[in-house]
C-alpha cells in the first residue's frame, strides 16, 4: 500500500462505522445508558467523560461525539438552578471526546500524524495512549470531585495538584532508574 492508501483506509473505515452508528441509532442508545446513571448525579460528570472517551475512541471522531453527547449533557441539567453542573457535564463530554479521539487508531488526526511522521501507525497510537491514560485517570478523579463539590474551579485546582503530584512521582521514579 502507498502512503495515501494507508491514510485513506482507516478514514474510510471510520466513515463506514459512523454510517452504521447512525443507522443503529447509537445516539439514542448512549442516551439510554447515560440516562440510567442520572440517579447517581454526583458521578454523572465522570460517567459522561468515560462514555465520551469510549464513543470517540470507537468512532474516531471527537466532533461526532460532541454532536451526540453535548445535547444529552445539557438535557440532564436543565435550568439556571443546575448551570454549574451543566458546565461541568459539558466539559466532561468535550474532554472525554478529545481524549478518545486522540488515542483512537481510526481517528483522522492520528492517522495523519503517524503518516506525516512516517512512523508505524500502531506504534504511534501506543505511545500516545501511555501519556493520555495518565491524564485520563486524573480527569476521571477530577470529574468525580466536580460531581461531589459541584464547583468547577475547586475540582480544577485539585486536578491540577493531582497531575503535578503524578508528574513529580514519575520524575522521581525515572531519576532513580537512571542512577
Language-model-derived ranges and their functions:
Residues 154-166:
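Small-residue-rich transmembrane alpha-helices that serve as helix-helix interface/gating elements
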Residues 2-3, 7-9, 178:
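Short, small-residue-biased leader/transition segments that mark boundaries at the very start
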Residues 82-84, 117-133:
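Membrane-interface alpha-helices at helix entry/exit sites of multi-pass transporters
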Residues 95-104, 128-142:
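Membrane-embedded alpha-helical segments of transport systems
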Residues 168-176:
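Membrane-interface capping segments at transmembrane-helix boundaries
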Residues 35, 74-88, 147:
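Helix-coil boundary and interhelical linker segments in multi-pass alpha-helical membrane proteins
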Residues 11-14, 38-76, 93, 97-101:
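Hydrophobic alpha-helical transmembrane segments of multi-pass integral membrane proteins
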